[in-house]
Design a protein with these regions (language model features):
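Interfacial loop-to-transmembrane junctions
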Residues: 237-258
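Perimembrane helix-loop junctions in membrane proteins
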Residues: 75-78, 236, 270-271
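Membrane-embedded alpha-helical bundles of polytopic integral membrane proteins
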Residues: 6-226
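Mixed-charge, low-complexity intrinsically disordered regions
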Residues: 1-4
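Short alpha-helix carrying the canonical HExxH Zn2+-binding catalytic motif
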Residues: 171, 188, 231, 248-249
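Transmembrane alpha-helix interface/packing and boundary motifs in multi-pass membrane proteins
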Residues: 226-227, 246
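Juxtamembrane boundary at the C-terminal end of a transmembrane helix
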Residues: 264-273
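Hydrophobic alpha-helical segments of membrane proteins
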Residues: 194-206, 230-237, 259-264
Length: 273
C-alpha cells in the first residue's frame, strides 16, 4: 500500500512521469494488441506481399492512433469535444496513409497537417494564441500518426524488419509493465524492459531475418532499446501532465521514436544492399 502511494505521488509530481495504471484489463488488451500486430505482419509474410503487410498493420494500428489523438486532445481540451474530434481525425488519416508504403509517411503527415490547419481556419472559439493552439493540436495528432504510418510502411521495406520491431517493442513493454507497475521508482520498469528486449534481440541475432545480418540486427536492437524508454517520456511531453489519462497514446508510446527511426535506417540498409 505504501509503495503504491509513493508511486502515485511520484506520477503526480513529475511532469514527465511514465505511469503504470493497473486498473482495468490492461494485460488482456496488451496481449490482443500484440496478437493483432503480429498477425497483421504475419499475413503479409504468408502472402509474401509487402503491400499486404503494410495494409494489414495500418488497419490494426490506425484506429489506435485515432483514439490516441482523441484522448490526447481530450487531455488538452476537456470542454471542447469538437476539437478532440479533429485531432482524432488528423491522427487517423496520418496513420492510415502508411498503407501506401514509405511515401505514405510524409503524405500522412501532410494530411494530418491539412486537417489541423483547416480546423484552425474554421474555429475561432479558443482563448489560446493561434501558434500555441497549433502546437497543442500538432502534439495531440501528428506524433502518433507518424509512428503508426512508419510501422505500417516498414513492411514495404522488409516484412522481417517490421515483425522484428514489433517483437522487440512488445518484449520491452511486457517487461517494463510487469516490473514497473510494482516498483516505487522510475528505473526498474525500463531496466526490466531492456532485459526482455535483449533476450528477443539475441533470438533475432540467431535467426537473422531479412534484411538483417549479424551486425545490423544488433544495431537495430540497440536503437530500439534507446528509443523505447525515450518514446515513453516523449508521450508524457505530449500531454499536459505525464499521468493524464490517454491509454491509447501509452499503447503507442514505445513506437513514437522507434518506428520512424527504424524506417529511416531500414531504407538506408536496403539501399546499401
Amino acid at each position: 500500500m505504501q509503495r503504491a502511494r509513493a508511486r502515485e505521488t511520484r506520477w503526480a509530481n513529475n511532469r514527465f512521469a511514465v505511469p503504470y495504471p493497473t486498473d482495468g484489463p490492461k494485460i488482456t488488451f496488451g496481449v490482443l494488441w500484440f496478437i493483432g500486430l503480429v498477425g497483421a505482419a504475419a499475413l503479409g509474410a504468408y502472402a509474401d506481399n509487402a503491400t499486404v503487410s503494410s495494409v494489414a498493420v495500418a488497419a490494426v494500428a490506425s484506429p489506435i492512433a485515432g483514439l490516441a489523438g482523441l484522448q490526447t486532445g481530450n487531455a488538452w481540451f476537456p470542454r471542447q469535444s469538437a476539437t478532440r474530434g479533429w485531432t482524432a481525425a488528423a491522427a487517423y488519416l496520418g496513420a492510415v496513409a502508411g498503407l501506401a508504403g514509405t511515401w505514405g509517411v510524409p503524405i500522412g503527415f501532410l494530411l494530418g497537417l491539412i486537417v489541423l490547419i483547416f480546423y484552425l481556419m474554421l474555429y475561432r472559439g479558443h482563448n489560446r494564441p493561434p501558434l500555441e493552439l497549433f502546437d497543442v493540436l500538432a502534439r495531440s495528432a501528428l506524433p502518433v500518426a507518424v509512428a503508426v504510418a512508419s510501422l505500417a510502411a516498414l513492411g514495404s521495406v522488409g516484412i522481417g524488419a517490421q515483425i522484428s520491431l514489433i517483437l522487440l517493442v512488445s518484449a520491452y513493454e511486457a517487461g517494463d509493465f510487469v516490473v514497473g507497475s510494482g516498483s516505487s521508482n522510475a528505473f526498474e520498469g525500463p531496466m526490466a524492459g531492456l532485459v526482455s528486449l535483449g533476450a528477443v534481440a539475441f533470438l533475432l541475432f540467431l535467426i537473422q531475418p531479412a534484411p538483417f545480418d549479424d551486425q545490423s540486427i544488433l544495431l537495430f536492437a540497440v536503437v530500439a532499446g534507446i528509443c523505447c524508454p525515450l518514446g515513453q517520456v516523449l508521450a508524457s511531453a505530449l500531454l499536459p501532465r505525464g499521468n493524464d489519462w490517454a491509454p491509447a497514446l501509452r499503447r503507442l508510446d514505445s513506437y513514437l521514436l522507434a518506428a520512424p527511426i527504424w524506417l529511416i535506417l531500414a531504407l538506408q540498409l536496403t539501399a546499401v544492399e
